[in-house]
Swiss-Prot record:
Its EC number is 3.6.1.66. Pyrophosphatase that catalyzes the hydrolysis of nucleoside triphosphates to their monophosphate derivatives, with a high preference for the non-canonical purine nucleotides XTP (xanthosine triphosphate), dITP (deoxyinosine triphosphate) and ITP. Seems to function as a house-cleaning enzyme that removes non-canonical purine nucleotides from the nucleotide pool, thus preventing their incorporation into DNA/RNA and avoiding chromosomal lesions. It is an enzyme of class 3 (hydrolase). Belongs to the HAM1 NTPase family. Homodimer. It comes from Chlamydia trachomatis serovar D (strain ATCC VR-885 / DSM 19411 / UW-3/Cx). The lineage of its organism: Bacteria, Pseudomonadati, Chlamydiota, Chlamydiia, Chlamydiales. PANTHER family: INOSINE TRIPHOSPHATE PYROPHOSPHATASE, INOSINE TRIPHOSPHATE PYROPHOSPHATASE/HAM1 PROTEIN. Substrate binds at residues 7-12, 71, 154-157, 177, 182-183. It catalyses: XTP + H2O = XMP + diphosphate + H(+); dITP + H2O = dIMP + diphosphate + H(+); ITP + H2O = IMP + diphosphate + H(+). Coiled coil: none annotated. This is dITP/XTP pyrophosphatase.
Length: 209
């Protein structure tokens, strides 16, 4: 069964491939394979809206089942920021390091507060080219570190200290992060839908023989 990972981010693609390969025989490809592809601008207010927007566009473009995700980092002390601006906090053309730098600058304005709590919200969607949508949500709670720690991961990983581990996402071994992150938890919740779609695909194939 052919399935598209609607992302060109190497880390996300790798994490999702590991998940899919555990579930069955898939012909997996991603937007990394299509550098000329232009995804739609993310205009959603929530991870669910963005995941569906990205996934539906890609599913209809490539005419195959597609997995798409979106995450937002929410910091109550900053009024919910970066929130829907998580991917563009320091500007549309800024990189991950720029976003982390701006976040730390904003946190320094709150030195008198002890509340550095934060959480990720994530939605992962499985979408057919005909608009059938399955979705799963997950979140992870933690705190924002005072400085970047760790060298792995991406995005806000060097700043997000996950509860129970006392380490940032970027300090955790990739194999561990791929089990405990918000995206990993959402993928696990999506698993029954993926298995059902695969089973139906295999059944349809047998009936056509």
């Amino acid at each position: 069964m052919k399935i598209l990972i609607a992302s060109s981010h190497g880390y996300k693609v790798r994490e999702t491939k590991v998940f899919l390969k555990k579930l069955g025989e898939f012909d997996i490809f991603s937007l990394v394979d299509y550098p000329s592809y232009h995804p739609p601008k993310e205009t959603g207010e929530t991870p669910e809206e963005n995941a569906i927007q990205k996934g539906l566009f890609a599913a209809q473009t490539f005419r195959c089942w597609t997995i798409a995700d979106d995450s937002m980092l929410i910091i109550p002390a900053l009024g919910g920021l970066p929130g829907k601006l998580s991917a563009s906090f320091a500007g549309e053309q800024a990189n991950d390091k720029d976003h982390r730098k701006k976040l730390l600058e904003n946190m320094r304005l709150l030195e008198n507060t002890i509340d550095r709590s934060a959480y990720f919200e994530c939605c992962v969607a499985l979408i057919s080219p005909f608009g059938k949508i399955f979705k799963a949500h997950a979140s992870c709670e933690g705190t924002i570190a005072f400085e970047e720690r760790g060298s792995s991961g991406f995005g806000y990983d060097p700043l997000f200290v996950k509860h129970d581990y006392k380490q940032t996402y970027a300090e955790l071994p990739e194999a561990i992060k791929n089990q405990v992150s918000h995206r990993a938890k959402a993928l696990v919740k999506l698993q029954p839908y993926v298995e059902t779609v695969l089973a139906n695909h295999l059944l349809a194939g047998k009936e056509s023989l």
